[in-house]
From Swiss-Prot:
The organism's taxonomic lineage, starting at the top: Bacteria, Pseudomonadati, Pseudomonadota, Betaproteobacteria, Nitrosomonadales
Pfam families: ADK, ADK_lid
GO BP field: AMP salvage
One Gene Ontology molecular-function label: ATP binding
Subcellular compartments: Cytoplasm
Signal peptide: none
Pathway named in the protein's UniProt entry: Purine metabolism; AMP biosynthesis via salvage pathway; AMP from ADP: step 1/1
InterPro entries xref list: Adenyl_kin_sub, Adenylat/UMP-CMP_kin, Adenylat_kinase_CS, Adenylate_kinase_lid-dom, P-loop_NTPase
HAMAP family: Adenylate_kinase_Adk
Protein name (Swiss-Prot/TrEMBL): Adenylate kinase
Family: Belongs to the adenylate kinase family.
Stored PANTHER family: NUCLEOTIDE KINASE (PTHR23359)
Naturally occurring in which organism (per UniProt): Thiobacillus denitrificans (strain ATCC 25259 / T1)
Entry binding sites for AMP: 31, 36, 57-59, 85-88, 92, 156, 167
UniProt gene name: adk
Length: 217
């Protein structure tokens, strides 16, 4: 099972990725983790990436694809792999295709912007313990206070409505075109084209999980 998981910030990709990894016995491929591992190992690609990052630059798609190909040769990828957060752009998707990285399914978890804003901007955190709440879905017993200590809860900067809206803007501009790219490729039915599956990300996490599993077969 070789797949790409797409969806906006707050769509629930992380939760569903864990279910998929467990069911199919496949690793989640994170480009951030790969970069750190290659730099730590002192590989040629890792050193190139480190030099670029140290200079404040963005690591090129060529280097990332090289790391992806190396990562997929490792033993834990024998049953497949799950990409979450990569590719982010059409050029990255094209580079993966050109490099012959096989993909069986592209799964999009679809959640409307208004729902994502409600989910993320309603989160509250107790900093010392890491306990999380939600003003609508999982409220504390006393508004704004941690259930255990009674201490104040905070809203993280990442969860503020303006920040969430900016992240959604970036997603729509950069990553959402991938939905069309993979949908069109799947529709053409070319050899090597992945199957494209759109799943509603609204509802209980178990229902969403079961919908994904049913689609993957």
């Amino acid at each position: 099972m070789r797949l790409i998981l797409l969806g906006g910030p707050g769509a629930g990709k992380g939760t569903q990725a864990n279910y998929i990894k467990e069911k199919y016995g496949i690793p989640q491929i994170s480009t951030g983790d790969m970069l750190r591992a290659q730099i730590k190992a002192g590989t040629e690609l890792g050193m190139k990436a480190k030099a670029i990052m140290d200079a404040g630059g963005l690591v090129s798609d060529d280097i990332i694809i090289g790391m992806v190909k190396a990562r997929l040769q490792e033993a834990d990828c024998k049953n497949g792999y799950l990409f979450d957060g990569f590719p982010r752009t059409i050029p990255q998707a094209e580079a993966m295709k050109a490099a012959g990285v096989p993909i069986d399914y592209v799964v999009e978890i679809d959640v409307a912007d208004e729902e994502i804003i409600k989910r993320m901007s309603g989160r509250r955190v107790h900093v010392a313990s890491g306990r999380t709440y939600h003003v609508v879905f999982n409220p504390p017993k006393v508004a704004g206070k941690d259930d255990v200590t009674g201490e104040d809860l905070i809203q993280r900067d990442d969860d503020q409505e303006e920040t969430v809206k900016k992240r959604l803007d970036v997603y729509h501009a950069q990553t959402e075109p991938l939905v069309k790219y993979y949908g069109d490729w799947a529709a053409r039915g070319e050899a090597g084209a992945p199957k494209y599956v759109k799943i509603s990300g609204v509802g209980k996490v178990e229902q969403i999980r079961d919908s994904i599993f049913a689609a993957l077969g």
